[in-house]
C-alpha cells in the first residue's frame, strides 16, 4: 500500500511541477490542476478506505464537487480568453491591463 501512496505523491508532484514550469498556456495549467485534484482524490479515498472512517466518506465526493466547479470555471475562462484574444495565454488574464 505504501507503493500506491508513493505513486500518488509522485503524480501530485509531477502535476505541481508541470503547473509551475509550463504556465504559459491556460489549457496546460488546467490539465495540471486536474491531475493534482485526481491524485488528491485517490489518496483521500484510499486513506478513508484503509482507516474505515464512515463519517469521512463524504470528503472525496466534496473534493470532486470542487474539482468539477474548478474545471467549469477554468473552461469558461479558456473560452472567454480564446474568443477575446484568439490565443490561450495566461498572460492575457492580467486584470490590470486596459
UniProtKB/Swiss-Prot annotation:
It comes from the Eukaryota. Its main location: mitochondrion. GO terms for cellular component: mitochondrial inner membrane; respiratory chain complex I. InterPro entries: NADH_UbQ_OxRdtase_chain4L/K, NUOK/Mnh_C1-like. GO terms for biological process: ATP synthesis coupled electron transport. It is a multi-pass membrane protein. It holds the Pfam family Oxidored_q2. Its EC number is 7.1.1.2. GO terms for molecular function: NADH dehydrogenase (ubiquinone) activity. The chain crosses the membrane at residues 1-21, 29-49, 61-81. The keyword Mitochondrion applies. Keywords: Electron transport, Membrane, Mitochondrion, Mitochondrion inner membrane, NAD, Respiratory chain, Translocase, Transmembrane, Transmembrane helix, Transport, Ubiquinone. It is found in: Mitochondrion inner membrane. It catalyses: a ubiquinone + NADH + 5 H(+)(in) = a ubiquinol + NAD(+) + 4 H(+)(out). The keyword Transmembrane applies. Belongs to the complex I subunit 4L family. Core subunit of respiratory chain NADH dehydrogenase (Complex I) which is composed of 45 different subunits. Core subunit of the mitochondrial membrane respiratory chain NADH dehydrogenase (Complex I) which catalyzes electron transfer from NADH through the respiratory chain, using ubiquinone as an electron acceptor. Part of the enzyme membrane arm which is embedded in the lipid bilayer and involved in proton translocation. This is NADH-ubiquinone oxidoreductase chain 4L. The lineage of its organism: Eukaryota, Metazoa, Chordata, Craniata, Vertebrata. The gene is MT-ND4L.
Amino acid at each position: 500500500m505504501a507503493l500506491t501512496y508513493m505513486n500518488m505523491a509522485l503524480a501530485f508532484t509531477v502535476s505541481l511541477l508541470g503547473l509551475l514550469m509550463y504556465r504559459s498556456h491556460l489549457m496546460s495549467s488546467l490539465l495540471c490542476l486536474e491531475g493534482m485534484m485526481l491524485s488528491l482524490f485517490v489518496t483521500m479515498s484510499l486513506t478513508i478506505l484503509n482507516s474505515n472512517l464512515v463519517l469521512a466518506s463524504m470528503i472525496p465526493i466534496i473534493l470532486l464537487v470542487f474539482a468539477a466547479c474548478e474545471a467549469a470555471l477554468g473552461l469558461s475562462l479558456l473560452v472567454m480568453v480564446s474568443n477575446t484574444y484568439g490565443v490561450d495565454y495566461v498572460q492575457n488574464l492580467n486584470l490590470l491591463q486596459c
